[in-house]
């Protein structure tokens, strides 16, 4: 229902951001794959699609992970080990993404990886065979199919189900869906969305692919209007969503806009046609200032002030921060200390041993991982736009879609 491009959220006008370096100045000595460096430094790698037609928002995740590492290091590190963060950009190349993962594991000797890549299927088998845990994947097929991925929130297989629940509650019966032609998952999400939506009495009456570089989307807007759709989902980068919504409004067509996760951006608040927008989020809501988000905001304000003040500050930032918080929770659950090396095996032990109902201090729905099984979490947060402001819906609590077998997609309930 909520067709989304994984991590393709912010305005493409932001330009590109590519990093292959470290937050910490410490150099990681050579050591076996999955083993921590000697001394008090541990390497973590952030694999990202930092450049490409759908990825300018990834600069926010890189800045966020750097801020996370700096904050952790200034507060004692991971169980006494200083974090050496390496950020590797695949540029939307599957081959490069695989090379980056191999480099992170075999050369940088990273004991854990953050997934900010749209090409993660290319390295999923590699990281699994190396037994190096991947933190993240809330917006990824790998996040619910591969047991080596540990999403710090709801899993992607339930996105359309919970989107259909939200749409039904809003009285939607006819939907329009336009989606990016550049990334395969866009079309795949639409197909699955149609199947799930039908169970909730919602029909997709107009579906069309769009290109991010199109001069306008007037034709699609007029066709969607003619179809009688009262709601629309745009599976593309945030700037493209803005363009579509603005073009449709110019044609006198203002359907309720449905979206979620990384797509939502602060710039939407200035566009009247977004009023009434409804979004699903795999983690808690980034715009809330409360005990759950206080540490994130403190770290961003100190180490990456351009992130929260930017026009495209959004949920993708909180998701990335949550991935870091999950790693911290796993290290704590493993009982790691500065006296012993921090290894991939220890982190995996901690991930499987998280306390029952772990929410990372309120950042996520309750998390639970089972050894040998992919993550399976159907609980999302709901938000929207009302009178030019982001608002938490459903009392700020989660709404859960019916569970299906781990590693599978819901088709009907």
Roles of regions detected by a PLM:
Residues 36-41, 56-63, 75-143, 210-217, ...:
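Beta-alpha junction/loop-to-helix N-cap segments that form part of ligand/metal-binding clefts
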Residues 97, 151-176, 187, 215-218, ...:
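Hydrophobic alpha-helical segments within soluble ligand-binding/sensing domains
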Residues 50, 149-212, 230-231, 318:
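An alpha-beta-alpha
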Residues 130, 189-286:
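Extracellular/periplasmic bilobed ligand-binding domains
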Residues 19-40:
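C-terminal region of N-terminal signal peptides and the immediate post-cleavage residues
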Residues 104-117, 135-137, 174-179, 228-238, ...:
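Periplasmic-binding protein-like
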Residues 307-317, 328-392:
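Segments of small-molecule ligand-sensing domains
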Residues 247-321, 396-400, 410-411:
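Extracellular/periplasmic periplasmic-binding protein-like sensory domains
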């Amino acid at each position: 229902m909520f067709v989304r491009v994984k991590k393709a959220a912010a305005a493409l006008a932001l330009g590109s951001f590519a990093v292959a370096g470290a937050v910490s100045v410490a150099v990681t000595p050579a050591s076996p794959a999955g083993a921590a460096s000697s001394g008090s430094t541990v390497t973590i790698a952030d694999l990202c699609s930092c450049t490409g037609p759908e990825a300018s928002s990834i600069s926010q995740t890189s800045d966020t992970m750097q801020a996370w590492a700096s904050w952790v290091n200034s507060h004692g590190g991971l169980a006494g080990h200083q974090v050496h963060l390496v950020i590797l950009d695949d540029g939307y190349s599957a081959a490069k993404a695989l090379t980056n993962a191999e480099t992170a594991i075999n050369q940088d000797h990273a004991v854990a990886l953050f997934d900010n890549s749209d090409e993660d299927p290319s390295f999923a088998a590699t990281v699994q065979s190396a037994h190096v845990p991947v933190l993240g994947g809330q917006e990824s097929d790998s996040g619910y199919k591969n047991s080596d991925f540990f999403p710090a929130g709801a899993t992607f297989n339930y996105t359309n189900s919970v989107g259909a629940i939200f749409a039904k509650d809003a009285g939607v019966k006819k939907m329009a869906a336009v989606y990016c032609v550049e990334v395969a998952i866009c079309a795949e999400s639409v197909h699955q969305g149609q199947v799930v939506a039908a169970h909730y009495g919602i029909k997709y009456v107009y579906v069309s692919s769009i290109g991010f570089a199109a001069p306008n989307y007037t034709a699609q807007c007029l066709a969607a209007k003619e179809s009688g759709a009262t709601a629309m989902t745009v599976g593309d980068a945030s700037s493209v969503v803005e363009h579509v919504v603005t073009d449709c409004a110019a044609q006198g067509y203002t359907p309720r806009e449905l979206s979620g996760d990384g797509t939502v951006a602060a710039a939407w608040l200035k566009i009247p046609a977004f009023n009434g927008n409804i979004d699903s989020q795999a983690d808690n809501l980034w715009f809330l200032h409360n005990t759950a988000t206080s540490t994130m905001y403190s770290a961003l304000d100190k180490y990456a002030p351009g992130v929260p003040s930017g026009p495209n500050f959004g949920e993708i930032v909180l998701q990335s921060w949550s991935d870091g918080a999950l790693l911290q929770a796993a290290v704590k659950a493993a009982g790691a200390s500065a006296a012993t090396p921090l290894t991939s095996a220890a982190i995996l032990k901690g991930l499987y041993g998280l306390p029952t109902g772990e929410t990372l201090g309120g950042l996520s729905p309750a998390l639970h991982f089972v050894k040998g099984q992919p993550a399976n979490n159907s609980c999302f947060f709901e938000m929207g736009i009302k009178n030019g402001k982001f608002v938490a819906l459903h009392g700020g609590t989660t709404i859960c879609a019916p569970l299906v077998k781990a590693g599978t997609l819901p088709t009907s309930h």
